[in-house]
From Swiss-Prot:
GO biological process: cell division; negative regulation of division septum assembly
A Pfam family of this chain: TetR_N
Subunit structure: Homodimer. Interacts with FtsZ.
Keyword Cell division listed: yes
Homology family: Belongs to the nucleoid occlusion factor SlmA family.
Organism this protein belongs to: Haemophilus ducreyi (strain 35000HP / ATCC 700724)
Residue ranges of every copy of the HTH tetR-type domain listed in the record: 14-75
Protein name according to UniProt: Nucleoid occlusion factor SlmA
Entry keywords, A to Z: Cell cycle, Cell division, Cytoplasm, DNA-binding
Subcellular location: Cytoplasm, Nucleoid
Function: Required for nucleoid occlusion (NO) phenomenon, which prevents Z-ring formation and cell division over the nucleoid. Acts as a DNA-associated cell division inhibitor that binds simultaneously chromosomal DNA and FtsZ, and disrupts the assembly of FtsZ polymers. SlmA-DNA-binding sequences (SBS) are dispersed on non-Ter regions of the chromosome, preventing FtsZ polymerization at these regions.
Amino acid sequence: MTEPLIKMPKKSVKERQQQVLEVLIGLLNSEQGMQRVTTERLAKAVGVSEGALYRYFPSKSKMFEALIERIEQTLTSYINASKRKENSTALAVKAILYTVIEFARKNPGVTRILTGHALMFENSELKLRVAKFFDGLELQFVNILQMRKLREGKAFQDERALAGYLVTFCEGQFLRLVRSNFSSNPHQHFEKQWSLIKPLFE
């Protein structure tokens, strides 16, 4: 007697969306990460038709937008955890810089998105979304620097300028990683680089 087929439960739209994002970041993390991720390539990796992809996201741009939002949320949680561990502003900033750079090192696909390399053939609005990501990172630094007056009784001459400098430092590390195809170690000279930044907190 033939046993009845057991139907596996269908994944919800949200579960499928998460699966698509996981596969997308996996493709960007791979050795072929610098190659353009077409919907055909993505659909094949997910195991669905191209048409099915658009049941979960209206466009490829929306996939990247969702991925950038996810990156933002993840990194923000890491940053918040890092700054809670330190009492001084200088040590909190140092910990955050280290965390951001380590996140970039461990996630090549993320870094390729944030430097724009993975978005070269995509909708120009995505570049604006990445710019918004860095604006948010700068604002987090501004908030930490402004808290120094309450925590330590000292204020910086220009928190916004210093925050912009710290974000530029992070962006430079991202670009260096991509340029070296992630063969460089951003932590190799981190302590020496921090020794140049530290006097700004004295």
